């Protein structure tokens, strides 16, 4: 299985013949191209056109993040799998209000079901979350009445507000208090973890879209515009609770991530390099971990689940099979 490469240090990414290496002031590390799926760059890294040409030939994506861990863009090799037919079907389902709303509703419903699964998981392990679960279930009953994607987004936002109230109960750690959701910049340690982990889920979904016939620029819950990819944001809603949030709960509850892994920057709090390494390792392990897939009858990784989700969306767009969002079984 191909791997993701994370570069946190400053240095230069270079091509040498048919391989890559990353060079810092202290060392040179060779990168096996045949085993690399994508490169995520968090440090100050220089490269040249010759390298980018080689990455295109090797079909390796580069995702760039700023110092604070926010996604800023990708080097996306030419769309070798893009299908004109699929782009037309994506556009058709976006331009038709009913078809777009149908898909958007499924993304929200999938996200909410997985949020509930996470809460039930911790409730069954001694965390008192019954009131929050009941409130989320109550709000979710309004989804079928939505007539616009804005209304759907409002409901999801309301549910996430209640969901975030569970974080302090689940974590029970005086060094990691949620308070309220803040971003750009995050105001505390938990928000710094959430923002960083969410960025990783967005880019993972983008990398997997690249391996399908879908175009990431056409989403349904998040409005398509000139500025950004949106389909990966839609799909990420389903997986953030079971990948990003579970990763955060794990490293905080196990005391793996600590206050010294954060630093103040301007008017916010960000992960330092060691903190980023800790969360990156946990996220990578979670994406590579497997579950038993009921329909396929075999174990698949969480990264593979994202790819399978995209294949289901393709079938829906081609009107071969109605899309049903993935809901975890634990």
UniProtKB/Swiss-Prot annotation:
Protein's UniProt keywords contain Nuclease: yes
Keyword match Zinc: no
Pfam families xrefs: Cas_Cas1
Cofactor: Mg(2+); Mn(2+)
GO MF assignments: DNA binding; DNA endonuclease activity; metal ion binding
Binding site for Mn(2+): 156, 222, 237
Biological-process GO terms, alphabetical: defense response to virus; maintenance of CRISPR repeat elements
Enzyme class at the top of the EC tree: hydrolase
Coiled coil: none
EC number: 3.1.-.-
Keywords for this protein: Antiviral defense, DNA-binding, Endonuclease, Hydrolase, Magnesium, Manganese, Metal-binding, Nuclease
UniProt record similarity statement: Belongs to the CRISPR-associated endonuclease Cas1 family.
Xref: HAMAP family: Cas1 (MF_01470)
PANTHER family per record: CRISPR-ASSOCIATED ENDONUCLEASE CAS1 (PTHR43219:SF1)
Function: CRISPR (clustered regularly interspaced short palindromic repeat), is an adaptive immune system that provides protection against mobile genetic elements (viruses, transposable elements and conjugative plasmids). CRISPR clusters contain spacers, sequences complementary to antecedent mobile elements, and target invading nucleic acids. CRISPR clusters are transcribed and processed into CRISPR RNA (crRNA). Acts as a dsDNA endonuclease. Involved in the integration of spacer DNA into the CRISPR cassette.
Oligomer status and interactors: Homodimer, forms a heterotetramer with a Cas2 homodimer.
Full protein name: CRISPR-associated endonuclease Cas1 2
Species of origin: Thermodesulfovibrio yellowstonii (strain ATCC 51303 / DSM 11347 / YP87)
């Amino acid at each position: 299985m191909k791997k993701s490469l994370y570069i946190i240090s400053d240095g230069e990414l270079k091509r040498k013949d048919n391989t890559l290496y990353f060079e810092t002031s202290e060392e040179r590390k060779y990168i096996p191209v045949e085993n690399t799926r994508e490169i995520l760059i968090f440090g100050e890294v220089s490269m040249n056109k010759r390298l980018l040409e080689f990455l295109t030939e090797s079909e390796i994506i580069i995702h760039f993040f700023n110092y604070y861990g926010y996604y800023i863009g990708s080097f996306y090799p030419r769309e070798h799998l893009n299908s004109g037919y699929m782009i037309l079907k994506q556009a058709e389902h976006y331009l038709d209000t009913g078809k777009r709303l149908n898909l958007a509703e499924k993304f929200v419903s999938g996200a909410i079901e997985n949020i509930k699964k996470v809460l039930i998981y911790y409730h069954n392990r001694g965390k008192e979350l019954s009131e929050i679960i009941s409130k989320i279930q109550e709000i979710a009953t309004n989804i079928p009445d939505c007539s616009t994607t804005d209304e759907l987004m409002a409901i999801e936002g309301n549910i996430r507000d209640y969901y975030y109230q569970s974080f302090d109960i689940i974590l029970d750690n005086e060094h990691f208090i949620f308070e309220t959701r803040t971003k750009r910049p995050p105001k505390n340690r938990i928000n710094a973890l959430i923002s960083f982990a969410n960025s990783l889920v967005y880019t993972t979904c983008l990398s997997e879209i690249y391996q399908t016939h879908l175009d990431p620029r056409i989403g349904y819950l998040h409005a398509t515009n000139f500025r950004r990819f949106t389909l990966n944001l839609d799909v990420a809603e389903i997986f953030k609770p079971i990948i990003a949030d579970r990763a955060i709960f794990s490293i905080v509850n196990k005391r793996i991530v600590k206050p010294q892994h954060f630093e103040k920057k301007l008017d916010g709090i960000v992960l330092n390099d060691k903190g980023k390494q800790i969360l990156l390792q946990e996220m990578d392990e979670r994406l590579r971990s497997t579950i038993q897939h009921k329909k396929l009858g075999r174990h698949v990784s969480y990264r593979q689940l994202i790819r399978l989700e995209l294949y289901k969306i393709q079938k829906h767009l081609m009107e071969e099979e109605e899309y049903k969002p993935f809901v975890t079984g634990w």
